[in-house]
Curated annotation (Swiss-Prot):
Organism of this sequence: Californiconus californicus
Superkingdom, taxonomy of origin: Eukaryota
Chief location: secreted
UniProt keyword annotations, A-Z: Bromination, Disulfide bond, Gamma-carboxyglutamic acid, Hydroxylation, Ion channel impairing toxin, Neurotoxin, Secreted, Signal, Toxin, Voltage-gated sodium channel impairing toxin
A single GO molecular function term of this UniProt record: ion channel inhibitor activity
Signal peptide location: 1-19
Protein name (record): Mu-conotoxin cal12a
Propeptide span(s): 20-42
Length: 87
């Protein structure tokens, strides 16, 4: 029972991994889940550099996982542009 509870909690926290860590991932492109595309609130990203505004932050283009992302050179583990999520 305890193991089941722990697994449920981990599965619930999985989409919010970027709240726990802000590590850069340099490797294969990751997919952006559809629910993140629907969370648009206010523009904090520069649309001229290919970032997509979402919940006071932005996620990186799948075509450019190592750059072209809100004037940064990489993305966090959950596709957030560093330094924009809580601006």
């Amino acid at each position: 029972m305890k193991l089941t509870c722990v697994l449920v909690v981990l599965l619930l926290l999985l989409p919010y991994g970027d709240l726990i860590t802000n590590n850069y991932i340099r490797g294969a492109a990751r997919k952006v889940t559809p629910w993140r595309r629907n969370l648009k609130t206010r523009d904090v990203c520069d649309s001229l550099v290919g970032g997509h505004c979402i919940h006071n932050g932005c996620w990186c283009d799948q075509e450019a996982p190592h750059g072209n992302c809100c004037d940064t050179d990489g993305c966090t583990a959950a596709w957030w542009c560093p330094g924009t999520k809580w601006d």
